[in-house]
């Protein structure tokens, strides 16, 4: 019988290790006991997945292959050591080798009671659903006063103690035999037919149709129309394919889409129950063969792109347009990164188009205030542009009936919008050369994307929260998936290679020069890519709370439990890669919060997300508290100062301007209590717990400001609609981490710059992995302009210099 024995401490001197070594010798005729140490297992950190580390994979493999497991634990503060707890966290996070595995607990400690309380706690952990070990009931071996229990040879001195240990161990051997019989695969049969079930997806109900024969799951059809395009698409192919291939429900959830993944698995399980089958039998079956591929692979290409979001895919498409080979490596199962989670609004001044639209009330006043800015407060490198802008606006104000814009207005707003001072008194603003490239070439990015296949809606000029001006170009297809779908299609049609589930870990260096990258595949296999150039486009670190806290110099506090709008993939990998070869960092202390995020999930597209000109924000007293047209950090700080939670108030007309929803979704959210609706403002106030008279007064005042085109309370930058037509809505909102402005230092050609100021040969970067453009605060809509503009530039420079 093959047993794994785990020393439950990383201490160099341990009586639990001595106990297991004694058991290995004493029971050598009964079992082959392999003792494993946990010293090299990292502390568990959910935001930095290290499941693929050899130390963790070694435990996963050996435990999976063993007949049973013994854990020897000491007792620290009435519980198990943190190092042992970390191991169990890793072994129940992405891999689950202890599921159903027969397990025996032993323990040694200095105290007379042995490790009784630690063993009790350990048993509770092992019984948890994510671990689900088959712990032997009853018999526990507790070795008290362990420092007196062994002789110099490491043998137990007391015959009675040895007898008790033998009794426990022999019971465990019998327990292993019985428990493993229960783990043997069972046959399952179904009542053949087609079964309709409804399960829960990320965005709501997920209808499914499952077809079963008497012995097999034959077909799985999913109505995914209610889910966000791009984010969960991989779920609707991978999960059903692996279920059908292996005839198993032992399928891993897709990273970044675990709610929808588990919804699909639950839906199939419900269908199996309806057909008279037992889904638990299928949960114990092996994974599908395709899910177990561990073969190392090696590739060669001209340019390798690290990251499959908007910046990475734009760079890849541009490499292909230059006639070169490209590979995109994306660590998550699906492409898209933060781009697919964005609102799809791309800032670019397009005056000829914009002037065909009328100005909104307050916009001319906004420009008048801007050009009155004291020139002494403008940085020297921006001053000439500011003076030219003053002349442009002065001429415009002679007839301010239409929507004005220019590259220079965009540049100055990006500069002023990003100009911030941190808690240490350090003032930052965007690098002029980088901001100039952004605002001069962003319209080229719009035209380039249209040529790639993105269909833009030219019927209106859009504006996201914190943008400061209406200049956003919006695809007809909702949100950011339009960009990802078009670029993905272009890359695949033009023979580009995309590998998902491929996390880059290191550069390949030859004589100090970058010659490609090393990566880990889905099952820990090594992926080697030789290339002439590397483009880092892996995003920022908005989903890595510890890293945010480490670098933060702007916010007074970043809470451990803060929500994020980001993909879980956005954890700073590319920044750390750059640091590993001496890349300089810039602006790392500044992160941005999205003020209008879901209080429970951090999502930005629940409730009613409308243009800022239609924002009416009220606090928990029913009062407005900020200029809703302001920058994101201004809105977030104001919200935090007002308790965090606030409400966006809308009426039927404002609801029609929402860019993120449908009537069906609205009904579901109202029913779920995550969106409030009422026929009167008084009734709405009661639902959200504010004084009705206060809310009515607030809205009446706001409506009068819309009529006047001026807000005497908060000087709102622009207005559109009044709040006057029932039904009325309240969307709960709370700030969540959204964007990190800092990252790798680059120049205007997207070279990554070393700490000594020199370029790193063959290394380029684009998008949120870089810093220097947005400084202390990013304008809404500038992220997409950034990634598509500098993604193209990075590719062009890489091809010109290296290929």
Curated annotation (Swiss-Prot):
Q: Which UniProt keywords apply?
A: FAD, Flavoprotein, FMN, Oxidoreductase, Phosphoprotein
Cofactor: bound how, per the entry note? Binds 1 FAD per subunit.
> What is its cofactor?
FAD; FMN
Q: Which InterPro entries match?
A: FAD-dep_OxRdtase_2_FAD-bd (IPR003953), FAD-oxidoreductase_2 (IPR050315), FAD/NAD-bd_sf (IPR036188), Flavocytochrome_c (IPR010960), Flavoprotein-like_sf (IPR029039), FMN-bd (IPR007329), FMN_Rdtase-like_dom (IPR005025), Succ_DH/fumarate_Rdtase_cat_sf (IPR027477)
Q: Name one Pfam family in it.
A: FAD_binding_2
Might you give the EC number(s) for this enzyme?
A: 1.3.99.33
> One GO cellular component from the entry?
membrane
Q: Give the highest taxon in the source lineage.
A: Bacteria
Q: Which residues carry this modification: FMN phosphoryl serine?
A: 258
The main enzyme category here is oxidoreductase
Gene3D superfamilies named among the record's database cross-references: 3.40.50.360, 3.90.1010.20, FAD/NAD(P)-binding domain (3.50.50.60), Succinate dehydrogenase/fumarate reductase flavoprotein, catalytic domain (3.90.700.10)
* Role this protein plays: Catalyzes the two-electron reduction of urocanate to dihydrourocanate (also named imidazole propionate or deamino-histidine). Dihydrourocanate is present at higher concentrations in subjects with type 2 diabetes, and directly impairs glucose tolerance and insulin signaling at the level of insulin receptor substrate (IRS) through activation of p38 gamma (MAPK12)-p62-mTORC1. Therefore, the UrdA enzyme from the gut bacteria S.mutans strain UA159 may contribute to the pathogenesis of type 2 diabetes by producing the microbial metabolite dihydrourocanate.
Q: What else is known?
A: S.mutans strain UA159 is significantly more abundant in subjects with type 2 diabetes (T2D) compared with subjects with normal glucose tolerance (NGT).
Q: Which NCBIfam families match?
A: flavo_cyto_c (TIGR01813)
Q: Which family does it belong to?
A: Belongs to the FAD-dependent oxidoreductase 2 family. FRD/SDH subfamily.
Listed name of the protein: Urocanate reductase
Origin species: Streptococcus mutans serotype c (strain ATCC 700610 / UA159)
């Amino acid at each position: 019988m093959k047993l794994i024995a785990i020393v439950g401490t990383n201490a160099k001197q341990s009586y639990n290790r001595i106990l297991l070594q004694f058991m290995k010798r004493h029971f050598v005729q009964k079992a082959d006991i392999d003792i494993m140490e946990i010293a090299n297992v990292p502390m568990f950190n959910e935001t930095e997945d290290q499941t693929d580390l050899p130390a963790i994979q070694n435990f996963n493999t050996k435990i999976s292959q063993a007949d049973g497991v013994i854990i020897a634990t000491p007792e620290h503060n009435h519980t198990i050591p943190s190092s042992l707890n970390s191991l169990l966290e890793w072994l129940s996070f992405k891999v689950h080798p202890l599921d159903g595995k027969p397990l025996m607990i032993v323990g040694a400690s200095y105290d007379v009671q042995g490790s009784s309380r630690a063993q009790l706690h350990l048993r509770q952990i092992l019984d948890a659903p994510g671990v689900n070990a088959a712990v032997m009931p009853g018999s526990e071996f507790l070795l008290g006063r362990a420092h007196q229990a062994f002789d110099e040879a490491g043998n137990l001195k007391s015959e009675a103690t040895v007898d008790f240990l033998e009794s426990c161990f022999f019971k465990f051997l019998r327990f292993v035999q019985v428990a493993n019989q229960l783990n043997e695969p069972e046959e399952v049969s179904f009542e053949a037919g087609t079964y309709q079930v409804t399960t829960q997806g990320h965005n709501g109900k997920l209808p499914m149709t499952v077809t079963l024969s008497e012995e097999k799951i034959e077909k799985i059809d999913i109505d995914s129309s209610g889910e966000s395009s791009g984010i969960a698409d991989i779920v609707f192919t991978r999960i059903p394919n692996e279920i059908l291939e292996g005839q198993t429900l032992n399928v891993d959830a897709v990273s970044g889409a675990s709610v929808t993944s588990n919804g699909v698995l639950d839906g199939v399980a419900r269908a199996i129950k309806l057909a008279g089958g037992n889904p638990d039998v299928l949960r114990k079956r092996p994974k599908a063969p395709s899910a177990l591929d561990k073969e190392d692979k090696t590739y060669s290409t001209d340019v390798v792109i690290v990251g499959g979001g908007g910046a990475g895919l734009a760079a890849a498409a541009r490499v292909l347009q230059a006639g070169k080979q490209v590979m995109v490596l994306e660590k998550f199962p699906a492409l898209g990164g933060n781009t697919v989670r964005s609102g799809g609004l791309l800032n670019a001044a397009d005056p000829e188009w914009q002037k065909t639209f009328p100005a909104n009330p307050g916009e001319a006043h906004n420009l008048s205030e801007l050009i009155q800015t004291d020139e002494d407060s403008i940085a020297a490198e921006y001053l000439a542009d500011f003076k030219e802008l003053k002349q442009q606006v002065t001429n415009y104000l002679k007839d301010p009936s239409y929507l004005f814009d220019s590259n220079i207005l965009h540049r100055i707003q990006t500069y002023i919008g990003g100009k911030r001072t941190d808690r240490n008194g350090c003032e930052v603003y965007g690098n002029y050369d980088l901001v100039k490239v952004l605002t001069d070439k962003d319209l080229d990015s719009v035209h380039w994307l249209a040529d790639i296949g993105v269909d833009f809606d030219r019927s209106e000029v859009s504006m996201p929260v914190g943008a400061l001006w209406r200049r956003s170009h919006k695809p007809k297809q909702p949100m950011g998936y339009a960009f990802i779908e078009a670029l993905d299609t272009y890359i695949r049609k033009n023979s580009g290679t995309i590998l998902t589930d491929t996390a880059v870990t290191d550069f390949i260096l030859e004589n100090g020069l970058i010659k490609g990258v090393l990566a880990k595949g889905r099952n820990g296999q090594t992926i080697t890519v030789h290339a002439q150039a590397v483009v880092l486009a892996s995003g920022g670190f908005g989903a890595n709370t510890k890293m945010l806290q480490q670098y933060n110099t702007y916010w007074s506090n970043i809470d451990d439990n803060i929500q994020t709008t980001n993909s879980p993939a956005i954890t700073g990998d590319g920044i750390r890669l750059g640091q590993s070869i001496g890349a300089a960092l810039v602006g790392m202390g500044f992160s941005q919060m999205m003020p209008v995020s879901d209080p429970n999930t951090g999502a930005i597209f629940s409730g009613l997300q409308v243009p800022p000109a239609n924002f009416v924000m009220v606090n928990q007293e029913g009062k407005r508290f900020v200029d809703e047209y302001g920058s994101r950090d201004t809105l977030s700080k104001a919200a935090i100062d007002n308790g965090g939670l606030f409400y966006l108030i809308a009426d039927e007309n404002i609801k029609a301007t929402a860019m993120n929803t449908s009537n069906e979704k609205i009904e579901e959210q109202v029913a779920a209590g995550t969106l409030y609706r009422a026929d009167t403002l008084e009734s709405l106030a009661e639902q959200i717990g504010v004084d009705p008279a206060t809310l009515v007064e607030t809205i009446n005042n706001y409506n009068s400001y819309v009529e006047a085109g001026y807000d005497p309370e908060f000087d709102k930058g622009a207005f559109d609609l009044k709040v006057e037509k029932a039904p009325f809505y309240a969307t709960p909102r709370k700030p969540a981490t959204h964007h990190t402005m800092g990252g790798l230092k680059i120049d205007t050609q997207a070279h990554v710059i070393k700490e000594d100021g020199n370029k790193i040969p063959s290394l380029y970067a684009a998008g949120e992995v870089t810093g220097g453009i947005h400084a202390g605060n990013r304008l809404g809509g500038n992220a997409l302009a950034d990634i598509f503009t500098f993604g193209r530039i990075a590719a062009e420079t890489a091809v010109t210099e290296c290929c």
